[in-house]
């Protein structure tokens, strides 16, 4: 059984540039992936060579970090160290397998100061050759999407 370690060092600076425009013209910056060590946990599922972090299990308002280490029932692990996310993928050696690949998708939910909830997806597609080197890689980032707006209970004065 071979183990390939895929390093994703670009997600942290990518996410930290995320901005949301506010109604009053101001801009809020959400550094979503930071090595801040507070142990914010994510639910994780891994099928074949696909790694997906589905949602944060803790609410954080301006920062989300990936807890390390943890494993799922398949024995795969997803580890974050020093702002570098590593997906450790178990690759079975079936005959002459020349390469394998997959996609890592982080689905991050976060709240702003007014308790509106946003979701943002960060995708990383990759191929690994027989020498365990990344032969091709592609990044995708979606804009933050408002998925839950805070209910306003105050009566407006006329």
Model-derived segments and spans:
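Membrane-proximal alpha-helical anchors
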Residues: 1-42, 47
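An amphipathic alpha-helical interaction surface
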Residues: 42-45, 49-158
């Amino acid at each position: 059984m071979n183990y390939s370690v895929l390093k994703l060092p670009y997600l942290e600076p990518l996410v930290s540039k995320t901005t949301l425009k506010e109604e009053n013209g101001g801009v809020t910056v959400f550094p979503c992936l930071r090595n801040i060590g507070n142990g914010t946990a994510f639910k994780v599922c891994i099928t074949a060579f696909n790694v997906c972090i589905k949602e944060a299990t803790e609410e954080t308002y301006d920062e989300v970090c990936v807890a390390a280490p943890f494993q799922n029932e398949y024995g795969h692990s997803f580890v974050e160290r020093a702002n570098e996310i590593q997906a450790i993928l178990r690759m079975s050696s079936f005959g002459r397998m020349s390469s394998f690949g997959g996609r890592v998708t982080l689905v991050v939910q976060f709240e702003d100061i007014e308790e509106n909830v946003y979701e943002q997806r960060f995708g990383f597609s990759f191929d690994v050759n027989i020498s365990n080197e990344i032969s091709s890689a592609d990044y995708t980032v979606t804009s933050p999407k408002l998925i839950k707006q805070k209910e306003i209970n105050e009566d407006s004065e006329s």
